[in-house]
Amino acid sequence: MARSKTSHNWLKEHFDDKYVKMAQKDGYRSRASYKLLEIQEKDKIIRPGMTVIDLGAAPGGWSQVTSRLIGGQGRLIASDILEMDSIPDVTFIQGDFTEDAILEQILEAVGNTQVDLVISDMAPNMSGLSAVDMPRAMFLCELALDLAGRVLRPGGDFLIKVFQGEGFDIYHKDIRKLFDKVQMRKPSSSRDRSREQYLLARGFRGIDGAASIERF
């Protein structure tokens, strides 16, 4: 079957992309690594020895960056519905995060450890229909926030990919109840046409200080 013009254009854009070329040169698995690196350069959210959870981790770009920054004394638990080639000292849990069984596996891996940072680059498969895509995206955001509320230590941080649209304002309001400081980030490595942004919430107050966000 011949490739469509749209498919051809996407491939050309992909391989002409400077961040794709940089990832190949620097040994990163995806251009997404540079989104996290840019946020890290500005906000210093990852430090040696931290315990971190990486949601939507495959193919592993964010996990590569995080693992290097937390070092040998740190701990990284990564999860994705897709397979991910192993990374030294990274615990990987494959499965659908919307299923309770996968949540329980992540919680079991965390154990009694208090987590310093939860990062999420999760996104649903996009149909191009906002009425379909936004509820799916917000559902993943709610589940990630629920996990963060369960595992973060007081003062911990939360970084998540979001798409502004129906449901975002309520979500943003919920997060502001749970964290001391909430900011939006749009890394230069995020494609211009993409509606994605990253919400950075710092200084977790603990569930006792705000309404709990229930898992759907």
UniProtKB/Swiss-Prot annotation:
Record carries keyword DNA-binding: no
Location of the protein in the cell: Cytoplasm
Class of the enzyme per the UniProt entry, highest EC level: transferase
Protein name (record): Ribosomal RNA large subunit methyltransferase E
CC annotations in GO: cytoplasm
Gene that specifies this protein: rlmE
Catalytic activity: uridine(2552) in 23S rRNA + S-adenosyl-L-methionine = 2'-O-methyluridine(2552) in 23S rRNA + S-adenosyl-L-homocysteine + H(+)
Top-level taxon of origin: Bacteria
HAMAP family: RNA_methyltr_E
A GO molecular-function descriptor: rRNA (uridine-2'-O-)-methyltransferase activity
Annotated keywords: Cytoplasm, Methyltransferase, rRNA processing, S-adenosyl-L-methionine, Transferase
Binding positions (S-adenosyl-L-methionine): 60, 62, 80, 96, 121
EC number: 2.1.1.166
